[in-house]
């Protein structure tokens, strides 16, 4: 059995978990998330714990049990604490601002880029060169951050572009004569 799946997911106070067949719904102060658990995984709810075990005779069930446990744990953390992702804009004239339910980016193109935010994700700009994304769905926050970064990825010679706050951009040496 997967080492990750052996540990049960504890359900904190204020979080409501509903298991309907293979559909798991987690509800908390930050919203509601639901996910369909793979058929190779058996989920049991005992008091304030969820346990995940692989079904017998299915190839890859151990791996699916560990994956399901990690995804559900992220859902529980998301509805209680939430997740944040920080982006930095590095470059002359690179700016960001919030316009309603979208992030307006000035990234050196001839036109400003507007990225609409999906439901459940909020953004704020503490400064013109910083974007902070917040929400309950870890996967969705990562996807939105990756989409914004894809408009202008950091280039390797000067490091200009949109980068994650914890990302280290390796700078190449310029060509010598």
Curated annotation (Swiss-Prot):
| UniProt keyword annotation of Ribonucleoprotein present | yes
Q: What does this protein do?
A: This protein binds to the 23S rRNA, and is important in its secondary structure. It is located near the subunit interface in the base of the L7/L12 stalk, and near the tRNA binding site of the peptidyltransferase center.
Under the subunit heading, UniProt states: Part of the 50S ribosomal subunit.
Q: Which Pfam families match?
A: Ribosomal_L6 (PF00347)
Gene Ontology CC terms, in alphabetical order: cytosolic large ribosomal subunit
Q: What is this protein called?
A: Large ribosomal subunit protein uL6
Q: Which keywords label this protein?
A: Ribonucleoprotein, Ribosomal protein, RNA-binding, rRNA-binding
Q: Which GO terms describe its molecular function?
A: rRNA binding; structural constituent of ribosome
Can you cite a GO biological process for this protein?
Answer: cytoplasmic translation
Family classification: Belongs to the universal ribosomal protein uL6 family.
Q: Which InterPro entries match?
A: Ribosomal_uL6-like (IPR000702), Ribosomal_uL6-like_a/b-dom_sf (IPR036789), Ribosomal_uL6_a/b-dom (IPR020040), Ribosomal_uL6_bac-type (IPR019906), Ribosomal_uL6_CS (IPR002358)
